Each structure stands twice: as C-alpha cells, then as structure tokens.
C-alpha cells in the first residue's frame, strides 16, 4: 500500500517499478517535452523515436499502477518545434497515439493558455523582414484526461 500524501522523488520509471500494480487512483504529471530544457538528470534533446519509446515505457508503467477505474492527467503542449530533430511536431496527437497503444481510454482535454507566455516576444518574421520562413510560437498547452478501464469510480468519496 502507498502512504497517502507521500511525495516520491526519483526516476519515474524506476520508482513506478517499485510500487504495487493496481494501487493508484490518479496520476498527474507534466513530462519533459523534449525541447531542449536543461534538466539536472534528464536529456531533453532525444531523437524523437527514442523520446516516443521512452514515453511509451513510462506510460506503460503508469497504466499498470492505476486501478481499473484509475485516471491520468497529463499536461503537454499542443505542438513543439524540434528543429534539427524533425521540425514541428503536433505533440498532443503523437502523445495520444502512444497513450492508445498502451491501453488508455480518452476522457477529455482541458485547454490551457499562459497569461504571459515567456516567449511571447518571439516574432513570426523568420528571416529579417521576409516571410520565407516564419517562426510560429503557440503558447497554448493542454491537459489530456484519460482512464484505464472504467471511467466511473467504483468507490465514491
């Protein structure tokens, strides 16, 4: 049994392997987006195929941890730009395809919008004063809501 309210810090895949299957009601997470953020222990510039394999691995572990009426809430961007690793990615679509492969069932999506996007000063000019290659920054993110087998909770409260 997992201690209520306990925060566990560590590599998500390794930690999830130590927890009992079918013991979790809800997982809330915001995984790395693979856009080059300088994390202490995670490489955020993986080849996209490697990134999706890693995503499938941790989602599989999460799926096993959930109770049959368990749910998952995952904060991700709608799209990303991984310039030298394949260009623009419709991230939410790719991510959801992996979730379906693992077995998750879609419940909904929550649209998020940054009040003051940290990159809002990025222009869409591309080359100086030329529309040849505009840069588009989408400040919106979303939360994908999904469940394991049963949307309705067996135990209320």
Question: Residues of each region from the PLM?
Answer:
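Core catalytic lobe of class I
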Residues: 1-157
